[in-house]
């Protein structure tokens, strides 16, 4: 877990959208799967920014804080990675954001696919401890917005190519720099300066594309 300065209610149609997209990771070989019935130790210990609640991994960074947590179960080569993410309390729909971490090497070197409660998404690279924009913030077609919204996020990596999806609709593709010796994957969240945002994650799944 890393922190850096910087009621779970959902409408029925949000739930339906998430359920219909539940099989997004289409690889035949499941490499890792977590429905968060229990907090697996490969997520680390619960703390003030991350806990298990009602079968969800709940992440709540303090105001103006970044949080990311890789899962240490495996090192992967190519992956098809997906998760259901709920915006519980966004506080600021432009400045709050959450998503998936991939091509993770260490605290200073990884990529993040992020979605904000306003329906915009972006991709960032953290290299040598600095944030580098890979895909600038822009509208993500098919994204559900606001508090209570559930969105299925998906990342596929094949070699140096990565593709990003929101609720089954492709957002962008890019050519990046994957680690030479395998990647970890995980989750990511940011709270705005106005206050602590809360996001929850469920149905985290990694398959072989």
PLM segments and residue spans:
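Short carbohydrate-recognition loop motifs
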Residues: 48-67
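Short tryptophan-centered beta-strand motifs in secreted/extracellular beta-sheet-rich domains
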Residues: 36, 81-83, 146-158, 162-164
């Amino acid at each position: 877990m890393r922190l850096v300065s910087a009621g779970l209610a959902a409408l029925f149609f949000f739930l339906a959208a998430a359920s219909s997209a539940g099989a997004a990771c289409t690889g035949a070989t499941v490499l890792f799967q977590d429905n968060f019935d229990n907090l697996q130790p490969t997520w680390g210990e619960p703390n003030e920014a991350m806990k298990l609640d009602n079968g969800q991994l709940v992440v709540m960074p303090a105001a103006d804080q970044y949080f990311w947590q890789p899962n240490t179960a495996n090192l992967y080569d190519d992956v098809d990675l997906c998760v259901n993410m709920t915006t519980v309390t966004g506080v600021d729909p432009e400045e709050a954001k959450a998503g998936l971490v991939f091509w993770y090497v260490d605290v200073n070197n990884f990529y993040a696919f992020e979605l904000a409660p306003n329906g915009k998404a972006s991709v960032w690279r953290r290299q040598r401890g600095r944030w580098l924009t890979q895909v600038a913030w822009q509208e993500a077609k098919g994204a559900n917005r606001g508090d209570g919204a559930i969105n299925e996020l998906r990342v596929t990596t094949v070699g140096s190519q990565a593709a990003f999806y929101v609720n089954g609709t492709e957002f962008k593709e890019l050519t990046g720099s994957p680690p030479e010796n395998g990647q970890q994957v995980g989750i990511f969240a940011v709270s705005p300066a106005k206050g602590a945002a809360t996001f929850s994650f469920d149905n985290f799944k990694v398959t072989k594309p």
